């Protein structure tokens, strides 16, 4: 796969050589390596000799060979960036209880001890937060399924493990209503971690560009919704309505054209802002199914046709296949997709 993009560092041409995926099955993580070749400038052709007429040479006192000029080859610099993405942090109560300390506080550093080295080694690491940080002062006890609420110490543990971004758009984002929804963002952002997919206000930008080793990667995050409530805002997980418009990136399976139109607009904005590679995280599919369903496959192909470079899925709680999709619109474009990352942390051994 070769792409030619205008690099905003001068007039260099950037070639996206390949997005490589390596599965770390023990950690249910995916490492995406973006490799770019940066050219030093446009190729300048070597000078050619001017045409000559067949005439007798005119003798001169001293004949010398004209100097030859050799144009140097453009210098190429290879830049790489590794993005590690791992699955859902599903904080069931047995998992929450493992973090309880004798003084009443919580510490979850130990749950990342086997993947911390991988997380820290990547240039940029992402995890899906499938719980909320509502605290206990707002009438919500710590709880697991079906309405998740976890101690703030989990956010501290993700930072300690080396994560840079938490995905916050999923079907459990609104488990503790708008209070917990917004407090979750405040807790995570307060630690200096980035969030993607949910927002404190409708005015916030719905995508981000992360500069990783000089490579600008545009990112989006979406979750499925289960219809709209009376206020015209989405219901997540089939329960309470969000109630505020424009604070969550979501799609409805019964209105995918609206989703594609919105993503296409954001994709254009990211590229205009300098994104050299683009990726989207999508919370979709059917839980506990080992293979992507028809909706996932069709949506993935459409996103590939739109020009996204990488698609990473979540929600099924199991690892689903990796594939390399060929665009129907551009013969030179391919998209790497992992249909589902599975769980990173949970108390699930079997479906349901």
Across the structure, where does each feature detected by a protein language model lie?
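Acidic, metal/ion-coordinating pockets
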Residues: 15-41, 52-53, 58-59, 65-352
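Intrinsically disordered, low-complexity polyampholyte segments enriched for Lys and acidic residues
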Residues: 3-6, 61-65
């Amino acid at each position: 796969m070769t792409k030619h993009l205008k690099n905003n560092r001068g007039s260099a041409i950037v070639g996206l050589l390949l997005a490589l995926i390596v599965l770390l099955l023990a950690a249910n993580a995916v490492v995406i390596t973006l490799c770019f070749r940066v050219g030093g400038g446009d190729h300048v052709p070597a000078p050619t000799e001017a045409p000559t007429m067949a005439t007798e040479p005119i003798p001169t006192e001293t004949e010398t060979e004209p100097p030859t000029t050799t144009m140097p080859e453009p210098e190429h610099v290879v830049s790489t960036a590794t993005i590690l993405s791992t699955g859902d942090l599903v904080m069931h109560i047995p998992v929450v209880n493992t973090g309880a300390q004798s003084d009443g506080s919580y510490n979850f550093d130990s749950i990342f001890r086997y993947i911390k080295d991988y997380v820290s080694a990547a240039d940029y690491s992402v995890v899906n937060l499938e719980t909320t940080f509502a605290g206990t002062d707002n009438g919500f006890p710590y709880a697991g399924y079906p309405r998740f609420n976890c101690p703030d110490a989990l956010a501290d543990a993700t930072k300690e493990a080396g994560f840079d971004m938490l995905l916050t758009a999923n079907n459990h984002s609104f488990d503790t209503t708008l209070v917990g929804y917004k407090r979750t963002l405040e807790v995570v952002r307060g630690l200096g971690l980035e969030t993607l997919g949910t927002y404190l206000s409708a005015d916030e930008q719905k995508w981000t560009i992360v500069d990783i080793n000089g490579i600008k990667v545009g990112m989006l995050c979406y979750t499925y919704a289960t219809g709209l409530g009376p206020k015209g805002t989405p219901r997540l997980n089939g329960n309470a309505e969000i109630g505020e418009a424009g604070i969550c990136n979501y799609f409805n399976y019964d209105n995918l054209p609206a989703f594609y139109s919105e993503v296409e607009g954001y994709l254009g904005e990211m590229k205009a802002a300098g994104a050299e590679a683009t990726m989207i995280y999508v919370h979709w599919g059917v839980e506990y199914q080992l293979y992507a369903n028809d909706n996932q496959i069709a949506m993935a192909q459409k996103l590939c046709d739109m020009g996204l470079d990488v698609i990473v899925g979540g929600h099924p709680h199991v690892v689903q296949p990796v594939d390399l999709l060929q665009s129907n619109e551009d013969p030179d474009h391919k998209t790497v997709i992992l249909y589902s990352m599975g769980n990173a942390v949970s108390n699930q051994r079997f479906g349901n």
